[in-house]
Amino acid sequence: MEVAEANSPTEEEEEEEEEEGEEPISEPRPHTRSNPEGAEDRAIGAQANVGSRSEGEGEAATADDGAASVPGAVPKPWQVPAPASEVQIRTPRVNCPEKVIICLDLSEEMSVPKLESFNGSRTNALNVSQKMVEMFVRTKHKIDKSHEFALVVVNDDSAWLSGLTSDPRELCSCLYDLETASCSTFNLEGLFSLIQQKTELPVTENVQTIPPPYVVRTILVYSRPPCQPQFSLTEPMKKMFQCPYFFFDIIYIHSGPEEKEDDMSWKDMFAFMGSLDTKGTSYKYAVALAGPALELHNCVAKLLAHPLQRPCQSHASYSLLEEDEEAGEGEATV
C-alpha cells in the first residue's frame, strides 16, 4: 500500500510565496438589478460624462446630435440661432401624458395638387395632412387615453382652433372645415407666444430622477415659399426651448428645385427652424411637395414615439435588419 507523501516544509513555503506574489485580479460584477449595466465597475473618469447622451438614448443632448443638417444651407442675416447648449440633461424615459399641439399651415401652397397619392392620382398637401393628423391623434389616443391634443391653424397669424382635449373626435370635428389663403408673412413669434399663453410647462424638483406629470409637444406642418419669418427670441421663449419637457417637431413640405437660386432657399428656412432646438431632442423632416404622399405618412408615423422615450433623430433606426438600414432610412428622407 502506497502512502502519499506530504509536502515538505520547503515546498509549502514556496507555494505561499507564489500566492503572495500574485496580484488579485478583480473580475467585473455581472449585470444584475443591483448592478445595472455594470455601473460600479465603470472607470472614475467616465463619471464626468454623467448626464450626457450615450448611443442615442432618449435623453436631452446638444444641438449637434439632433440637428437636421441640410447641405448648402447658408445663414441669413435674420437667422440668429441660439448658441449650442453645452448643458446635457438626462430625463426619465417614461410614457407620461403628452399635450400635443398640432400646428397646421393653411397657406395656398397646401392646396396645390402635386403630391402623388397611393392610386397614382395627384392630391394636395392639405388633404394628406388632414388624414395623417387624424390617424396620428387616434393612434396616440389608443396608446394612452390621457394624451391631450390641440389644433392651431397658421395663416399670416395663428389661431387656436381646438383646445386641449383627450377626445380625438373633438379635434377631428374641426379638422376638415379648413380653407387655405394667400399668406404674405409667417409670424413664428406669434405662434410661440400663443402656445405660451395656452399651455404651462411642468416643473419637477429633480429633472433626472422625477418623471414630469406631462410633456408639451408642438408639431408644425409647414408648407410655403421661404420667407423671412417674424421672429425674435425673447427670454420667455428661450426658457421654453430650454425646458426639457418641451419639444418642437417639424414637417416641412417644400417645393424643392422649383425655387429660384436668387431667392432664399427652403434649406435656409429648414435649417433656421432646426436651430431653435438647442437640446437636440426634436425631430425635423423635409418632404418634397412633388413627391409621393407616402413619404409624408412615413414622417408622421415616426412621430408617434413618445418624446421622452425616443432616441435623438440622428440615432433613430427603423429597420429590422442591418442590411436594410439604408433602404429603411430612405423611405422618409428626401
Curated annotation (Swiss-Prot):
Cell location: Cytoplasm; Nucleus
Domain of life of the source: Eukaryota
Chain intervals for the UniProt region annotation (Disordered): 1-79
InterPro entries reported for this sequence: BABAM1, vWFA_dom_sf
Keyword Chloroplast recorded: no
In-chain residues carrying the UniProt-annotated modification N-acetylmethionine: 1
Bias (Acidic residues) ranges: 10-25
Family statement: Belongs to the BABAM1 family.
Organism this protein belongs to: Rattus norvegicus (Rat)
Protein name listed in UniProt: BRISC and BRCA1-A complex member 1
Entry keyword set: Acetylation, Cell cycle, Cell division, Chromatin regulator, Cytoplasm, DNA damage, DNA repair, Mitosis, Nucleus, Phosphoprotein, Ubl conjugation pathway
Record-level Gene Ontology MF annotations: identical protein binding
SUBUNIT field: Component of the ARISC complex, at least composed of UIMC1/RAP80, ABRAXAS1, BRCC3/BRCC36, BABAM2 and BABAM1/NBA1. Component of the BRCA1-A complex, at least composed of BRCA1, BARD1, UIMC1/RAP80, ABRAXAS1, BRCC3/BRCC36, BABAM2 and BABAM1/NBA1. In the BRCA1-A complex, interacts directly with ABRAXAS1 and BABAM2. Component of the BRISC complex, at least composed of ABRAXAS2, BRCC3/BRCC36, BABAM2 and BABAM1/NBA1. Identified in a complex with SHMT2 and the other subunits of the BRISC complex.
Main location: cytoplasm
Its biological purpose: Component of the BRCA1-A complex, a complex that specifically recognizes 'Lys-63'-linked ubiquitinated histones H2A and H2AX at DNA lesions sites, leading to target the BRCA1-BARD1 heterodimer to sites of DNA damage at double-strand breaks (DSBs). The BRCA1-A complex also possesses deubiquitinase activity that specifically removes 'Lys-63'-linked ubiquitin on histones H2A and H2AX. In the BRCA1-A complex, it is required for the complex integrity and its localization at DSBs.
Domains as described in the record: The VWFA-like region is similar to the VWFA domain. Its presence reveals similarities between the structure of the 19S proteasome and the BRCA1-A complexes.
GO BP terms, alphabetized: cell division; DNA repair-dependent chromatin remodeling; double-strand break repair; hematopoietic stem cell proliferation; mitotic G2 DNA damage checkpoint signaling; positive regulation of DNA repair; response to ionizing radiation
Positions of the UniProt region annotated as VWFA-like: 100-303
Gene coding for it: Babam1
Sites of Phosphoserine modification: 8, 34, 54
Entry annotated with the keyword Nucleus: yes
PANTHER family assigned: BRISC AND BRCA1-A COMPLEX MEMBER 1 (PTHR15660:SF1)
Gene Ontology cellular-component terms listed: BRCA1-A complex; BRISC complex; cytoplasm; nuclear body; nucleus
